[in-house]
């Protein structure tokens, strides 16, 4: 439930400030994808984006970096 109350609004409220590539990353996470391997390497390969893009996306969502974003994403997906 926290996923819908916390993470989704954080992503959606920052969409207008994102590049097209960052918006593609956002859409991936808004689909509530559950994956086994939650590493930046896996995401950059799967989404065909650089690790820097993942970091910029996370920072625009209010996190210090992609690791912090993944930590919260993982926690919220568990609670869902």
Map each language-model feature to its residues.
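HTH-adjacent hinge/linker in prokaryotic transcriptional regulators
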Residues: 2-8, 13-27, 31-49, 53-80
